[in-house]
């Protein structure tokens, strides 16, 4: 379906010019989308996410469940039970979506949510023994996939450094900006 222009009362030349502007690529008409880094990164990310989904299916986790479960386990071991907000910030996920996914993980017996002793409005998360086992299996599966997927990129440490730079984070995940 073509976009209709609201050009009533305009001259024929103006209407023709406006229509051609819609049909003419504005920038880099000689470059393929497959030469643009952002477009390639988008497609590489989509491919990687599909492959992660396949790797996690036998474990019974979705990709976002895996990220939140593994992140909760990491944060809990490092600094104690995280709050839902801390988990969302660490994982880079929306707070509302994080809460919904945590509800699912809680129903499955993989995490528990408890009120913070100092502030009952804050929910603290603990990963259950079953959750730790599922996270460990999932981490093994994703690590194996990453070796295959990212192998063609060359040196792992160089790739991780580049990805950290692109993500705007240091080695501890602290924003560089």
How does the language model describe each region?
Residues 3, 103-161:
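Charged, amphipathic alpha-helical coiled-coil/dimerization segments
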Residues 37-56, 135-170:
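Hydrophobic alpha-helical core bundles mediating ligand binding, dimerization, or RNAP-core interactions
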Residues 46-94:
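N-terminal helix-turn-helix DNA-binding core of bacterial DNA-binding proteins
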Residues 84, 102-103:
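Short, hydrophobic-biased segments on the C-terminal half of alpha helices
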Residues 1-59, 157-158, 177:
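N-terminal leader segment of winged-helix/HTH proteins
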Residues 78, 168-177:
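Short, charged, intrinsically disordered terminal tails
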